[in-house]
């Protein structure tokens, strides 16, 4: 049971955003390889594992199906060292302010999702939940360093 718990912990901490599931797939593959007869990756990145049953025909079959991707964020712009972003998957923007993220740039960078203070928002927006168009990721780095380490299209996981 401890081994299962550790494997699950490892899986949920991996950056396996939709379309970029390779890290998660490799961990799952390593865990399943000793348990199955065949394992392969489809052209679209799905992992297929097969184990032959024992006993007389007809043998029962079991299908275990699960997704291995996770929701996350993608950098869409860089403004004075702050990162603009959009969602990858179904991210509810209400959960984002104050969320710690990892930006997967030229190296992994810790970041925090921040929003402007109320006095910088339009009066109608003050005191309310803001949309993603008002949120940024702040890595705490100077603008030049962010420009060197992060590119538009880089991902951020949480």
Q: Which residues fall in each region the model found?
A:
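N-terminal hydrophobic/helix-forming segments and targeting peptides
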Residues: 1-158
């Amino acid at each position: 049971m401890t081994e299962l718990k550790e494997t699950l912990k490892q899986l949920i901490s991996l950056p396996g955003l939709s379309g970029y599931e390779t890290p998660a797939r490799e961990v799952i593959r390593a865990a399943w390889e000793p348990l199955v007869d065949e394992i392969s990756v489809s052209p679209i990145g799905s992992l297929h594992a097969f184990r032959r049953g024992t006993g007389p025909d007809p043998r029962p079959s079991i299908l275990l199906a699960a997704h291995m991707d996770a929701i996350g964020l993608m950098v869409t712009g860089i403004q004075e060292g702050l990162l603009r972003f959009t969602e990858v998957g179904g991210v509810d923007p209400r959960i984002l302010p104050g969320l710690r993220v990892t930006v997967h740039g030229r190296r992994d960078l810790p970041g925090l999702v921040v929003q402007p203070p109320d006095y910088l928002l339009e009066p109608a927006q003050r005191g309310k939940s803001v949309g993603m168009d008002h949120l940024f990721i702040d890595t705490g780095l100077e603008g030049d360093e962010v420009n060197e380490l992060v590119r538009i299209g880089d991902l951020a996981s949480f």
